[in-house]
């Protein structure tokens, strides 16, 4: 881990503010050839054309995720959803469609520029059951037991206090609530030089939890029915792309990264008030 996580948080904020301004002013996609660090190949081809239909182009262009948590979350009409680190709002808008007018979709983000972009995207999408909140995922500004489902898209890995994030997620979920997150996860030993690199932390790699650690931290927070399903394992060419331009010996380190990082669906459930764990309908 980098020695000063406040510096990392500040760089993360600057990166996402820059991405939001780039989209808002008509710049290229964050995920295109002029991508910011960590934007590609993690963020490519996450949503299908049917999902994108009717969404503002700016919501798609600002997407910096590593999966599609709305496809994972099995949302139902009337539910309340919270997206941790909502960025330009794409997953919040998709969730709002799924939960319908009797439901609610919250987005939480710490970056003013992303919040402004997300609210503009909400206006363009014409969705009233959406609210974007300013705050940090380590201190969620919602009451206990207020949310049915928590989603997040390649954001938890950015936090320097993941235990606190998961405890906060558990706190705001209703009994029986669901945790359905896309994140970058590791499997096997990762070189310490990569773990300490600030740019790779900001790029969603250095801060990624080991698969077993993720499960253990979720369990320690109180969750049950924990599972992690890899959706894309990054190969050596992906590793080279991640490392290029970071001041790192690409030839030496890329082979050590091969098949050790993956995008995954992370699922968990908060036990019910009686301690029972609701059956998961699918998967």
Swiss-Prot record:
Pfam families to which the protein is assigned, alphabetical: Methyltransf_31 (PF13847)
One MF annotation (Gene Ontology) recorded for this entry: arsenite methyltransferase activity
Membrane-spanning ranges: none
EC number: 2.1.1.137
Key word Acetylation present: no
Keyword list, A-Z: Arsenical resistance, Methyltransferase, S-adenosyl-L-methionine, Transferase
Enzyme class name: transferase
Any Gene Ontology biological process: methylation
Reactions the enzyme catalyzes: arsenic triglutathione + [thioredoxin]-dithiol + S-adenosyl-L-methionine + 2 H2O = methylarsonous acid + [thioredoxin]-disulfide + 3 glutathione + S-adenosyl-L-homocysteine + H(+); arsenic triglutathione + 2 [thioredoxin]-dithiol + 2 S-adenosyl-L-methionine + H2O = dimethylarsinous acid + 2 [thioredoxin]-disulfide + 3 glutathione + 2 S-adenosyl-L-homocysteine + 2 H(+); arsenic triglutathione + 3 [thioredoxin]-dithiol + 3 S-adenosyl-L-methionine = trimethylarsine + 3 [thioredoxin]-disulfide + 3 glutathione + 3 S-adenosyl-L-homocysteine + 3 H(+)
Family recorded in the similarity comment: Belongs to the methyltransferase superfamily. Arsenite methyltransferase family.
Function comment: Catalyzes the transfer of a methyl group from AdoMet to arsenite, producing methylated arsenicals. Involved in the conversion of As(III) to a number of di- and trimethylated species, with trimethylarsine as the end product. Reduces the arsenic toxicity in the cell and may contribute to the global arsenic cycling.
NCBIfam families named among the record's database cross-references: PRK11873.1
Protein name: Arsenite methyltransferase
């Amino acid at each position: 881990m980098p020695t000063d996580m406040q510096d990392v948080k500040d760089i993360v904020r600057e990166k996402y503010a820059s991405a939001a301004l780039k989209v808002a002013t008509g710049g290229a996609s964050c995920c295109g050839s002029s991508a910011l660090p960590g934007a590609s190949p993690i963020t490519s081809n996450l949503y299908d054309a049917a999902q994108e239909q009717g969404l503002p182009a700016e919501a798609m262009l600002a997407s910096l995720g590593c999966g599609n948590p709305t496809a994972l979350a099995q949302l139902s009409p009337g539910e309340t959803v919270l997206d941790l680190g909502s960025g330009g709002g794409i997953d919040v808008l998709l969730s709002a469609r799924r939960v319908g007018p009797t439901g609610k979709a919250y987005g939480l983000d710490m970056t003013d520029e992303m919040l402004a972009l997300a609210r503009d995207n909400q206006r363009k999408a014409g969705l009233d059951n959406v609210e974007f909140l300013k705050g940090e995922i380590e201190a969620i500004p919602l009451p206990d037991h207020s949310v049915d489902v928590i989603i997040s898209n390649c954001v938890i890995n950015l936090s320097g206090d993941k235990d606190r994030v998961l405890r906060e997620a558990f706190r705001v979920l209703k009994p029986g609530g669901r945790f359905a997150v896309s994140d970058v996860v590791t499997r096997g030993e990762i070189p310490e030089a990569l773990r300490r690199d600030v740019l790779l932390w900001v790029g969603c790699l250095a801060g990624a939890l080991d698969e077993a650690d993720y499960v253990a931290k979720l369990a320690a927070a109180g969750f049950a029915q924990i599972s992690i399903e890899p959706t894309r394992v990054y190969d050596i060419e992906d590793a080279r792309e991640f490392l290029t331009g970071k001041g790192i010996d690409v030839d030496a380190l890329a082979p050590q990264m091969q098949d050790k990082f993956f995008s995954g669906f992370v699922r968990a459930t908060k036990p019910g008030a009686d301690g029972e764990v609701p059956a998961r309908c699918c998967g």
